[in-house]
Each structure stands twice: as structure tokens, then as C-alpha cells.
């Protein structure tokens, strides 16, 4: 470009007006540069085309995904020929489907979808994840509003109160050391029948302790009265 401008300046005669025209060669270079710039912008704007699957194609893809998450090249080729898709599109679909499956599995393991596990079939979520096993037993009964854990907690609280009362009546001196030294609390994993039996046993212990305390008190009063009578008889009153 500098050479062309220099040639134009040298060809100009002294005293003549300044040249305003550009040489044809310089015009061609400018047009070529502009064309390359437009071509680069066109390449940048190009995006990958998205494939719109039909319902039949999706059903076939999901059916094969239920059988295996990693189909081999022969299975992909056969499926692509049957569905009229390219093998690359089938492979990309399986990659996206596996990523979606892993995301659902992570949500299930985190407990996000435990309550809504029925929305996903076990084979669709993953063949190696049993969704039914993740559901709690009490979720099968929609009319039950109380969970087994709440039953165990309630029984444990009742048993704990009974144990505290029994321990206080049996030996007040050991109350400062805590009732669990004498009656350790049962774990939450015990069945409800065991907790109920332990609660009834503790209640019977409380009743026996109260009865023993009353009997001891009555016998002490009777002994005091008998001693008073003997003392009065000895003094001749």
C-alpha cells in the first residue's frame, strides 16, 4: 500500500491538484480484506444444529437405554439405520442421557427426590439403583401420618420418664449420678414391641417401688407407736 501511494505521489506533476482516486490494485486488496473479515464473522456465528427427535425415535432410544447405558458400535449402527439417524447423533443422545441419569442419581442420594421417587421408573433412573428400596416403608400407606421413627421417639421418651421416676424412688442417693447408670436408654433401632415391653416393665418397677415405700413408712409408724407404749409401761404411766 505504501509503494502504491508513493508511486501515485511521484506520478503527480508539481502544481497539479492532489490525487483523490485510488489505484485498482489497492481497491482489490481492500475488497479481499473485507471479504475475509466477513467470512470470519460468518464462521463465528455458525452454531451446531439441534436434532428434533420424533416420539417413535425417543421411545426406541429409551428402550435401548433401559437395556444398557453403554451400547456398542454395532448396536448404535443398527439403531441409527432403523431410526434414520446418524450414528453420531445416537451416540450424543446416549451421552446426554447418561449425564441426566447421573444427575438424577445424585439428587436421589442427597434425599431431594425421596418423596417423589415414584415419578421415575427404576429402570429409567438407573438399572443399578433400586428406587423402590429407597422409599420408606411408611410411604406405602398414604393414610398414615405418623412415621415409625416418631413412634420410637415417643416410646423412648415415655420409657425415659418412667426410668427416671423409678430410679428416684428406688435410690434417691444415686439421682445425682443420672438414671442412665442404672437403666441405660435403649437405642432407636429396637422394635416397637421391645420398647413397649420395656416401658411396661419400668412402670411396674415404679409401682412396686411406691408400694414398698408406703409399706415401709407404715411399718415405721407402727414400730414407733409400739416403742412408745413399751416406754410408757416401763415408766408406769
Swiss-Prot record:
SUPFAM superfamilies: Homeodomain-like. Residues 46-105 bind DNA. One of its GO terms (cellular component) is nucleus. Residues 24-42 have a biased composition (Basic and acidic residues). A motif (OAR) lies at residues 219-232. Disulfide bonds: none annotated. Expression restricted to a few regions in the brain: thalamic, tectal and brainstem structures that include relay nuclei of the visual and auditory systems as well as other ascending systems conveying somatosensory information. Not expressed in kidney, heart, lung, tongue and adrenal gland. One of its GO terms (molecular function) is DNA-binding transcription factor activity, RNA polymerase II-specific. It is found in: Nucleus. CDD domains: homeodomain (cd00086). Gene3D superfamilies: Homeodomain-like. Residues 1-50 are annotated as: Disordered. Transmembrane segments: none annotated. Belongs to the paired homeobox family. Bicoid subfamily. PANTHER family: SHORT STATURE HOMEOBOX (PTHR46255), SHORT STATURE HOMEOBOX PROTEIN 2 (PTHR46255:SF1). This is Short stature homeobox protein 2. The lineage of its organism: Eukaryota, Metazoa, Chordata, Craniata, Vertebrata.
Amino acid at each position: 500500500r505504501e509503494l502504491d501511494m508513493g508511486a501515485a505521489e511521484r506520478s503527480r506533476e508539481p502544481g497539479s491538484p492532489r490525487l483523490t482516486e485510488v489505484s485498482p490494485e489497492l481497491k482489490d486488496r481492500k475488497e479481499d480484506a473485507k471479504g475475509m473479515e466477513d467470512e470470519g464473522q460468518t464462521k463465528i456465528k455458525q452454531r451446531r444444529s439441534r436434532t428434533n427427535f420424533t416420539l417413535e425415535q425417543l421411545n426406541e432410544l429409551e428402550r435401548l437405554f433401559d437395556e444398557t447405558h453403554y451400547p456398542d458400535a454395532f448396536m448404535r449402527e443398527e439403531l441409527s439405520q432403523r431410526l434414520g439417524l446418524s450414528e453420531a447423533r445416537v451416540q450424543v443422545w446416549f451421552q446426554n442421557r447418561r449425564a441426566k441419569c447421573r444427575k438424577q442419581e445424585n439428587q436421589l442420594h442427597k434425599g431431594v427426590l425421596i418423596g417423589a421417587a415414584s415419578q421415575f421408573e427404576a429402570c429409567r433412573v438407573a438399572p443399578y439403583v433400586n428406587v423402590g428400596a429407597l422409599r420408606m416403608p411408611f410411604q406405602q400407606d398414604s393414610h398414615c401420618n405418623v412415621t415409625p421413627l416418631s413412634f420410637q421417639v415417643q416410646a423412648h421418651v415415655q420409657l425415659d420418664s418412667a426410668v427416671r421416676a423409678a430410679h428416684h424412688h428406688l435410690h434417691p442417693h444415686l439421682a445425682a449420678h443420672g438414671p442412665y447408670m442404672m437403666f441405660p436408654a435403649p437405642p432407636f433401632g429396637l422394635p416397637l414391641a421391645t420398647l413397649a415391653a420395656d416401658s411396661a416393665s419400668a412402670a411396674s418397677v415404679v409401682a412396686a417401688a411406691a408400694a414398698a415405700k408406703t409399706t415401709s413408712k407404715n411399718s415405721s409408724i407402727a414400730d414407733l407407736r409400739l416403742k412408745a407404749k413399751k416406754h410408757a409401761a416401763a415408766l408406769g404411766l
